[in-house]
Amino acid sequence: KKAKLGMAIKVLENAKMRNTGICGATETVLFHKSIAKKFINPLLNNLQKKGCNIYGDSDVKKIFKGKISLANKRSWHTEYLSSNISAKVVRDVYMAVKHINQYGTMHTDAIITSDKKTAKFFLKNIKSSIGIHNSSTQFADGGEFGFGAEVGISTNNLPPRGPVGLDQLVSYKYEVYGNGQIRK
């Protein structure tokens, strides 16, 4: 609920539209109810101008003045990998985390907020392998993490099949902190 509008517009545009076909592309945007009326139209209009189709819950549909389709339960599970995005209004960060953990891909999720306590709660409680604060989800890439070219992606908490020793039982969760960075 404590987000900078300019940063949110810039980061969401990059997170969704820079490259829509990668697993780090944003597929759902959640708006805190206290800022929904201020943020929904600028953010979603900007995406729509870039060619993005919007699927929103009934709250978003009431507020958004652009073209919108009503989201359904399947919308929240969909990894579009295209110029489509789902949008929903949530009561608080707890509801946001619950929604993400129920419907998300468990790959990468981000929060835009100036409230460090809220960001810390979000990053700690999402089940995603990468949690991002105030930066684009498009940074979710092996090369950006210094791992070199990716050979695969795992969102599982358990190690791969085969012999398992102590080293194979380690699972990582990455937290990325930013101040409005986008990926070029």
Q: Residues of each region from the PLM?
A:
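ALDH superfamily catalytic-core signature
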Residues: 1-82, 133
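Conserved C-terminal structural/oligomerization subdomain of aldehyde/semialdehyde dehydrogenase
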Residues: 72-184
